[in-house]
């Protein structure tokens, strides 16, 4: 039994020594060593933190959950933001995560609610997702409205637009609302990468054009499909 007591005393002695060192490091270690050690630990921590942060900013990470992979990602694939003649693709974080560091951290903190939803299966089935689609869309519309569609403008600049290459009504709308600052991208361009929810009662960002006045307003009567039909007719004019 004596060797057990000796082992315990030896372990306890090392624990108390370590505690004295970390509680009063300057009494045991030089200032230079502490400074260098603190710098190295800081670099390791910062590098690890940013590496983990960037891993969560990838399309692979976003679609690792079946809720995103089987719903919104499938809707993104047929759109021009996923595949186009120039080969420029907008991934999930390009549109849904701010690029500025401070805003990015704030968004990551907000994502804790999404982790909670994952754990408790808030949108674990297609039916649950469809029930929450409008609520989820409204949250994202409000976020983009608040930051003046910052993620859109990371790629699209009003000053770089060639109005001569746009459809007939687009330059008028952009000049009237976008260039003047009266509206922002998300006011008009909802549902560009994912299917729209039921849009009944949700006003569009644009005004009814004079040539359509007196006709049925698509966004008040037919939901998402009617809005898509209306946009299709606009593109052909």
Curated annotation (Swiss-Prot):
Residues 50-237 are periplasmic. It comes from the Bacteria. Heme 2 binds at residues 92, 95-96, 194. InterPro entries: Cytochrome_c-type_ET, Multihaem_cyt_sf, NapC/NirT/NrfH, NapC/NirT_cyt_c_N, NapC/NirT_cytc_sf, NO3Rdtase_cyt_c_NapC/NirT. Binds 4 heme groups per subunit. Substrate binds at residue 108. Heme 1 binds at residues 62, 65, 68, 114. Gene3D superfamilies: Di-heme elbow motif domain. Residues 1-28 are cytoplasmic. This is Cytochrome c-type protein NapC. It comes from Paracoccus pantotrophus (Thiosphaera pantotropha).
């Amino acid at each position: 039994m004596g060797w057990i007591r000796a082992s315990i005393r030896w372990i306890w002695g090392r624990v108390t020594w370590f505690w004295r060192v970390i509680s009063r490091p300057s009494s045991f270690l030089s200032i230079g060593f502490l400074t260098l050690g603190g710098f190295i630990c800081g670099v390791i921590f910062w590098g690890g933190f940013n590496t983990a942060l960037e891993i969560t900013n990838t399309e692979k990470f976003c679609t690792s959950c079946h809720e995103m992979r089987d719903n919104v990602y499938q809707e993104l694939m047929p759109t021009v933001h996923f595949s186009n003649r120039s080969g420029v693709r907008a991934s999930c974080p390009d549109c849904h995560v701010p690029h500025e560091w401070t805003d990015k951290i704030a968004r990551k903190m907000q994502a804790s609610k999404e982790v909670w939803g994952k754990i408790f299966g808030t949108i674990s089935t297609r039916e649950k997702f469809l029930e929450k689609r409008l609520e989820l869309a409204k949250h994202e519309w409000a976020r983009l409205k608040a930051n003046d569609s910052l993620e859109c403008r990371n790629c699209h600049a009003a000053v770089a637009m060639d109005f001569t290459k746009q459809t007939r009504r687009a330059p008028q709308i952009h000049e009237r609302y976008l260039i003047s600052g009266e509206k922002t991208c998300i006011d008009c361009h909802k549902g560009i990468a994912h299917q729209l929810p039921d849009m009944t009662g949700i006003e569009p960002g644009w005004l009814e054009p004079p040539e359509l006045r007196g006709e049925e307003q698509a966004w008040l009567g037919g939901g998402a499909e009617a809005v898509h039909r209306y946009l299709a007719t606009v593109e052909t004019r």
